[in-house]
């Protein structure tokens, strides 16, 4: 896979999702299905979107004991998604169990990505709420190395950290970066953000963009703007 814009379809129903996707005549944007939509509609929404020809990032952020995550991934592997994820904080045994569960009998599997720190987390929250008394970029780098050593394909991180992650873990270690906003847009609840062009310059492999596209007056134009700034 090359650089791509992943559209976060954070909708409450299949009806809303398809009404949004139907606007993209002749285009098949890479789609992220998150907790809200998946829990509302179940695995059938994945099958329906996949049948339309979209690549899918299933963003459920699994985090549990290793055996539970392994069994959950063994179920998710049958949905034919392109990318799925878990929390790096679950540690090495959980990540290795996830890989084992996700791998099909023929050896194929979706890409498996670990979430380091959510882009809504800032230094104050890291120290006061999570009780990690380290700089946030140091924590991300540690999680990135742990993830790579466990055999995963990359991490979800702020675009602020993507370049450093590639320096530490290599150019083939993928960085998927939310927290992307247009220069003239609202940052919302994100604390660590960049524009699509800045994310491209710093080396992000994929950007995940939600409200700047889904809530735009013209979602297709907003998507095309993202693609032009990040991919072209």
Regions found by a protein language model. Give the residues of each.
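Conserved anion-binding
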Residues: 2, 68-72, 77-153, 158-161, ...
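Conserved beta-strand positions in the central sheet of alpha/beta enzyme cores
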Residues: 6, 32, 57, 85, ...
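Conserved, mostly hydrophobic/aromatic
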Residues: 7, 31, 61, 84, ...
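Short, acidic/polar
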Residues: 12-24, 67-75, 134-146, 191-198
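Structural motif
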Residues: 26, 52, 79, 150, ...
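Glycine-rich phosphate-binding active-site loops on the catalytic face of alpha/beta enzymes
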Residues: 79-92, 189-222
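C-terminal helical cap(s) of enzyme catalytic domains, especially alpha/beta-barrels
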Residues: 95-101, 105, 200, 213-232
């Amino acid at each position: 896979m090359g650089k791509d814009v992943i559209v976060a379809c954070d909708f409450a129903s299949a009806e809303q999702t398809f009404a949004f996707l139907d606007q993209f005549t002749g285009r098949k944007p890479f789609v992220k299905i998150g907790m809200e939509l998946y829990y509302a509609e179940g695995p059938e929404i994945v099958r329906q979107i996949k049948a339309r020809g979209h690549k899918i990032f299933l963003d459920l952020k699994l985090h549990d004991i290793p055996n539970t995550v392994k069994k959950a991934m063994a179920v998710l592997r049958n949905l034919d998604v392109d990318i799925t994820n878990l929390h790096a904080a679950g540690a090495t045994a959980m990540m290795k169990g996830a890989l084992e569960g996700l791998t099909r009998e023929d050896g194929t599997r979706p890409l498996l990505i670990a979430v380091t720190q959510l882009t809504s987390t800032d230094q104050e929250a890291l120290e006061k709420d999570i009780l990690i008394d380290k700089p946030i970029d140091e924590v991300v780098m540690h999680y990135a190395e742990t993830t790579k050593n466990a055999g995963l394909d990359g991490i979800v991180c702020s675009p602020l950290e993507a370049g450093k992650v590639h320096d530490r873990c290599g150019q083939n270690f993928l960085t998927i970066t939310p927290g992307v906003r247009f220069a003239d847009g609202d940052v919302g609840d994100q604390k660590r953000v960049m524009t699509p062009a800045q994310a491209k310059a710093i080396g992000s492999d994929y950007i995940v963009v939600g409200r700047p596209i889904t809530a735009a007056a013209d979602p297709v134009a907003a998507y095309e703007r993202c693609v032009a700034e990040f991919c072209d």
